Amino acid sequence: MGEPTPTPAATYSAADPTSAPKLADLAAIKYSPITSSIATPEEIKAITQLWVNNLGLPADTVGTAAIDLARAYADVGASKSATLLGFCPTKPDVRRAALAAQIFVANVTPRQFCAYYAKVVWNLMLATNDPPANWAKAGFQEDTRFAAFDFFDAVDSTGALEPAECSAAPLTATCALDREVRRPCPSAYPERQPHHQHCRGHQGPSWLHQHSLRSACTPY
């Protein structure tokens, strides 16, 4: 006869890596999500401090400057090769490109920086009815034009800054709809792989036609 099957322990033991936790044990585990694709609040603060120290930005305006920079990246693509035009709205003698250069000094990429502000940028565009500049060229339709920026995937990430108020429909529902129909052309975002039409167990076209994307992707 073989060895008898051991009886599971009545209580979870953290000292035993094979001990089976109960739901109450899992609830007691404190976990903070960390992703390398989104800048951390500490990294964002380090970048804005560089703006103050190296470019002379007033310390009480760095938040506005950061949101403006992320919004500008939404128009041109959040990459090292992006050409940023215009000036910082809180210090008109400083170019946006100069602000962007300090991002690299902090060892952060433009995509990571922008991803932190994805929810803010998205709601800003909805509130002002001002989608990314090249949405049509990027292959988006009018109903999904507000999703036409290359850090949109961070809109429903817990690592992105959450606006105090949202001008859009609930993020999770709207993001599910927007991501479902995103079909940017390969030349617009070459790093993206083909997106299969499925979302939360629902299949593509037949499910999508039952929803009003216009109401989900435009401001109230």
Curated annotation (Swiss-Prot):
Database matches in InterPro entries: Pltvir_coat
Any GO MF annotation of the entry: structural molecule activity
Superkingdom of origin organism: Viruses
Record carries keyword Aminoacyl-tRNA synthetase: no
Annotated TM spans: none
Pfam families with a match to the protein in the record: Flexi_CP
Disulfide pattern: none
Subcellular location: Virion
GO (cellular component) term, any one: ribonucleoprotein complex
Record's keyword terms, sorted: Capsid protein, Helical capsid protein, Ribonucleoprotein, Virion
Keyword Ribosomal protein among UniProt keywords: no
Function comment: Required for genome encapsidation. Forms ribonucleoprotein complexes along with TGB1 helicase and viral RNA.
Family under the similarity heading: Belongs to the potexvirus capsid protein family.
Name of the molecule in the record: Coat protein
Source species: Cymbidium mosaic virus (strain Singapore)
